[in-house]
Amino acid sequence: MTKLTKMDYLVNIQNELKAPKNQFNNFGKYKYRSAEDILEALKPLLLKYGCYLTITETTQEIAGYLVLTSKVTISDGDKTIFVEAQAGINPERKGMDIAQSFGSSSSYAKKYALGNLFLLDDTKDADSSKVNEPVAKPKPKDMPGFKGTLNA
């Protein structure tokens, strides 16, 4: 058997990872997956392929806004690949204290970094309650700077 390269590991994990949207948002009436759901589905694959994952987070102020950056790194011990995602932090968010605001931004950034690294589709599920609602086609007047016709 040939030794898998780093990219082979990542490609196999991307293909085998199943992280279903098992959470439900009652307010928006849609299913979603959390960062924890992704990590739970990922652990057996990391073990199978002898890889490890690290997640580090940093905060910085950009143009007067607090921004949290989540960096997800996968490694086989020799080579590493990483992806970063950012989320704004609103310390004055209604109904949340500062720790909850940071936690919410952390979860969001982590989820999207994981999703980008492992190519997870984050569109709404096919069983979403809004799947059969008609979608309005954009009109040229709704698209500033558009000069032409739309063919659909």
PLM features: residue spans?
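Polyanion-binding surfaces on beta-sheet-dominated domains and ring/shell assemblies
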Residues: 1-152
